[in-house]
Every structure is written in C-alpha cells, then in structure tokens.
Amino acid sequence: MEKEKKDDEKPDLENSVDFSEQFNQLELLKTHGHLIPTGTQSLWVGNSDEDEEQEEKNEEWYQLQEKKMEKDPSKLLLWAAEKNRLATVQRLLSEKAAEVNTRDEDEYTPLHRAAYSGHIDVVRELVAKGADVHAVTVDGWTPLHSACKWNNTKVASFLLQHDADINAQTKGLLTPLHLAAGNRDSRDTLELLLMNRYIKPELKNNSQETASDIARRTSIYHYLFEIAEGCTNSSPPS
C-alpha cells in the first residue's frame, strides 16, 4: 500500500525454458529469426533489489515495531510481508495466528505487499502456505500487477509459474503488461511478459491504449514490443 499508493496448483515447468541473465531473448529472436514455441514461458530469475529498498533501520527498531503490533497478528503479518521479515511471517503462519490471505482496508493481502516490495523469499513462503495468487484489491490489482508495476521481475516470474493470470485486468482494464510498459526501468519485466506465449499485448485499458501505446509514450524500451510482434503465438513456417 504505501509503495503502491505512490502512484494451488503445482507450476508447470515441463514446458518452460530457463535462460541466462546475461542476454536478451527478444533481441536474440530478432537477430536469429526464431519463433517462441508453444508452451514457452520465461523463468527469468533476475537480481534482487531488496538490499537497496530496505531503509536504514536496525534490528532493534524492527523488533520494537513487531512488539507494538503483536496483539494484532493480521496487521503484523501484512507489515512483516512488506518489510521482508521472513522469520516473523513464518512464525505467524505456523502458529496460525493470522490468516495467510488476510487483507487491509484496500484489500491488499500479504502477498500483494511482498510482491510490490520485491521480497521473493516472503512470496515463496506465502504461496507455499496457500496465499491466493488471484486475490484482487479494491481496484482489481492482483499480486502480479503489483510485481510488474515495480519491475520486480523475479517475483513476477515466480507468480507466473504458480498460475497467476498474465492477462488479468484491473478495474481500469490495466494488465500487468500495461503497468510494466509505464515504468521507465522495466526492461526485465517487459522481456519476461513479452516472452510468454499466453500474453495478449492487444488488450486495451479504459483509455483505449494498448501496452505498446503506453511504452511508446513513456519508455525507452518500446522497441521490445516490435521485436516480440510476430514471435508470440506463432508457428515456424513449414
């Protein structure tokens, strides 16, 4: 919420492809003329920005905050998920002190908070304990929307492997791709989404804009849409 307001099935890995973090698959497609095969999805693992995101707070400060919220386990779980307090999240869930899909006043779950903050270990723990990857906020945001808005590619990749809907639309008809397209630092997330054969880049928001329209206006990476065009949902010539 604070950050956002500034502006279960097992994963199907059989049909997935992994790739190095050091090269651009979309540009490889362009230079080699390859097509994305049916069922392909990226397992990009990315780099975590958790250390950079964390404020300069010492352990004593965090423990003091937790003590203040101890009588409200749901509030504590939401806070701990956002602040990357993995041990606290694990304790609350193991003690069943708080429900894994508890919500705040705007219907954000702990998974939403961990997703927009980029805390992959907390995300893994929450999903393992039954967190709903399809949960929506009052504005219709899923955890995948939250991850893609803030270019948390590692989290987005994990959520997609756990059945998150890549084409889910908010109440404003925004897809995760729309949100990534509006972020000037979103190259990694754009690559992840555009490499997924199930992506529907033609979907429009309530302003009748596609993600490509937004990227051309706001991002230096609009060319990624041009590279991906004709590759996704295609079959090699016979």
Swiss-Prot record:
Where does this protein have compositionally biased stretches of type Acidic residues?
A: 48-57
**Looking at the keywords, is Membrane present?**
no
Tell me the residues on which Phosphoserine occurs.
S48
Localization: Nucleus
The answer on whether this UniProt entry bears the keyword Nucleus reads yes
Q: Which GO terms describe its cellular component?
A: nucleus
* Record InterPro entries: Ankyrin_rpt, Ankyrin_rpt-contain_sf
Found, by tissue, as follows: Expressed in spermatogonia, spermatocytes and round spermatids.
Question: Out of the domains of life, which is the source?
Answer: Eukaryota
The protein in question is named Ankyrin repeat domain-containing protein 49
Organism the protein comes from: Mus musculus (Mouse)
